[in-house]
């Protein structure tokens, strides 16, 4: 087999493997509607230790929130589209949950710590809901928590010199009071779907 042909076939194989992985990661649970709880391969670990600063400039760790249900989302305040949409979805879902929503602590963790200081995070998240807590930190701290939650993010600087953006994955993580992943939701999940799934999970915990 000639070298160019081998390279082409190798490239096709890589694309097929990646496509299969994406399809597995984003497939819904049996019986679920579009965007509802994503099923992960058995043994997949998401979540873990972190050391960050909240939007009131207080140091926090994963232990700060132990005993609480968490709704975690990663993004940044300069995000033009998916972040504000998702935060609004989270806020609306909490409203739909009524009193049950009080059991949830929503966390918005930045992937752009250079611009997202505690005060910037506070102003931003409270536009959506006063219950949402913004978390930031230094580059190493953000890299650590992103790795624990398997979050992809990368800085993208336009050639025209305009402000940079952050490319990042967009999933909502429901973590149980012991810090374990209870459910994972994709970016197309509606507030109604999110509220229903959370209500079901919390009901199972009783």
Regions flagged by a language model, labelled:
Residues 62-86, 90:
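Short active-site neighborhood of thiol/selenol oxidoreductases, capturing the structured segment around
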Residues 45-47, 69, 167-169:
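Short, small/polar residue-rich loop motifs at catalytic or cofactor-binding pockets
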Residues 71-72, 106, 172:
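Hydrophobic beta-strand anchors of alpha/beta hydrolase catalytic cores
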Residues 50-70, 94:
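A short beta-strand-turn-helix
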Residues 1-49, 205-206:
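N-terminal targeting signals for export/organelle localization
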């Amino acid at each position: 087999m000639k070298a160019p042909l081998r390279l082409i076939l190798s490239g096709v194989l890589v694309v097929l493997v990646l496509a299969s992985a994406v399809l597995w990661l984003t497939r819904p649970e049996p019986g679920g509607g579009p965007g509802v709880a994503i099923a992960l391969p058995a043994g997949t670990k998401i979540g873990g230790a972190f050391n960050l600063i909240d939007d009131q400039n207080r140091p926090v760790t994963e232990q700060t929130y132990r005993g609480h249900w968490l709704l975690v989302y990663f993004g940044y305040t300069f995000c033009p589209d998916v972040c504000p949409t998702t935060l609004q979805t989270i806020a609306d879902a909490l409203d739909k949950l009524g009193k049950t929503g009080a059991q949830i602590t929503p966390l918005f963790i930045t992937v752009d710590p250079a611009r997202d200081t505690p005060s910037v995070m506070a102003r931003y998240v409270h536009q959506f809901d006063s219950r949402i807590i913004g978390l930031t930190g230094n580059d190493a701290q953000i890299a650590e928590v992103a790795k624990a939650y398997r979050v992809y993010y990368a800085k993208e600087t336009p050639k025209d010199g305009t402000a940079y953006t952050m490319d990042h994955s967009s999933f909502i993580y429901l973590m149980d009071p012991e810090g374990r992943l209870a459910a994972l939701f994709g970016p197309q999940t509606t507030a109604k779907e999110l509220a229903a799934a959370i209500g079901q999970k919390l009901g199972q915990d009783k």
